[in-house]
Amino acid sequence: MGGLMKKNTVILGIESSCDETAASVVKNGNEIISSVVASQIESHKRFGGVVPEIASRHHVEQITLVIEEALTQANVTMDDLDGIAVTEGPGLVGALLIGVNAAKTLAFMHNLPLIGVHHIAGHIYANRFETEFKFPLLSLVVSGGHTELVLMKADNDFEIIGETRDDAAGEAYDKVARTLGLAYPGGVQIDKLAKEGEDTFHFPRAMMDDGSFDFSFSGLKSSFINTLHNLRQRGEEPNPNDMAASFQASVVDVLVSKTIRAAKKYDVKQLLLAGGVAANQGLRKRLIQEMKLELPDIELIIPPLSLCGDNAAMIAAAGTVSFLQGKRSSYDMNANPGLLLEDI
């Protein structure tokens, strides 16, 4: 590659914020040359959630192998890269450190620019593999740790116009799944059951009509757990499909109604779905239906399932945007579990 004629920007992305160790080579911020993800789901399953200590240990074991595999699959060497992008935060500090230290070491050894990336910016930029962004745009970010409505008027310009005041939607999914005795990760299991059930329990829709774009899922979670507990105390075992469908209907109602209201208010050109819960079939289906009805002129962009969960291609995509804007991180960059999206 190299030389003055070089037109392509080739970035290595590294992601280790939670329980996936991932590396990816991306060209021009929108073409995946390779993407390798080592998942730890099996190791965390018996604990019903991610154990930070176990996650860190897995990252240490996997990080070098995953990076080497990504370079091999892409048929590139370190000399072909223009820079290295890595998730700087938010996430589990011990997990983040593994990726950050690997990226810093490689960047230093090969004299390459280092670009720290916000994990949620990555989820949003996963949509760049689908299409170019048209501003202003709105992203509904739904994951295990985040539920946010993010307005963008330009690349890397993030304004959070709504967020959860307590539990993230993905967190509520996992807790509700545990009370039903479902395996981790719970979101997928609830989604499957919900397809076969009906919304017979009519759980609360918190903050649905309060005028803000904020969310709250702790009341729904409590209502679900109490309903299940009361039924079991009476010797009844409720239909898990209906319980799941009722829970999911409540979450999806709130997410979709607030998103559509925000899209109307801010007169956006595109609506993006982002984050792990973007894989949820119930949410996807409902968003597509409601957008067709309410906002047929706004382009709805939903990432493929392979790019909803944590991956490094999205980090490379977001990193490419920062790289082309001239943003660089210094070699003393550290893992930042409390990194704010609006600060980047």
Curated annotation (Swiss-Prot):
What is this enzyme's EC? 2.3.1.234
Keywords attached to this Swiss-Prot or TrEMBL record, sorted alphabetically, are:
Acyltransferase, Cytoplasm, Iron, Metal-binding, Transferase, tRNA processing
Q: How is the cofactor bound?
A: Binds 1 Fe(2+) ion per subunit.
Which Gene Ontology BP terms does the record give?
tRNA threonylcarbamoyladenosine modification
Q: Which GO terms describe its molecular function?
A: iron ion binding; N(6)-L-threonylcarbamoyladenine synthase activity
Alphabetical list of InterPro entries matching this protein: ATPase_NBD (IPR043129), Gcp-like_dom (IPR000905), KAE1/TsaD (IPR017861), Peptidase_M22_CS (IPR017860), TsaD (IPR022450)
Per the record, what are the reactions this protein catalyses? L-threonylcarbamoyladenylate + adenosine(37) in tRNA = N(6)-L-threonylcarbamoyladenosine(37) in tRNA + AMP + H(+)
Q: What is its main location?
A: cytoplasm
Task: List positions binding Fe cation.
Answer: 119, 123, 310
A single cellular component GO annotation: cytoplasm
Acyltransferase in keyword set: yes
Q: Which PROSITE patterns match?
A: GLYCOPROTEASE
Q: Which residues bind substrate?
A: 141-145, 174, 187, 191, 280
User: What's the top EC group for this one?
Assistant: transferase
Q: Where in the cell is it found?
A: Cytoplasm
Names of required cofactors: Fe(2+)
Keyword Oxidoreductase (UniProt): no
Q: Which family does it belong to?
A: Belongs to the KAE1 / TsaD family.
| HAMAP family in alphabetical order | TsaD
Q: What PANTHER family is this protein classified in?
A: TRNA N6-ADENOSINE THREONYLCARBAMOYLTRANSFERASE, TRNA N6-ADENOSINE THREONYLCARBAMOYLTRANSFERASE, MITOCHONDRIAL
Q: What does this protein do?
A: Required for the formation of a threonylcarbamoyl group on adenosine at position 37 (t(6)A37) in tRNAs that read codons beginning with adenine. Is involved in the transfer of the threonylcarbamoyl moiety of threonylcarbamoyl-AMP (TC-AMP) to the N6 group of A37, together with TsaE and TsaB. TsaD likely plays a direct catalytic role in this reaction.
Under what name is this protein listed?
tRNA N6-adenosine threonylcarbamoyltransferase
The lineage is: Bacteria, Bacillati, Bacillota, Bacilli, Bacillales
Q: Which gene encodes it?
A: tsaD
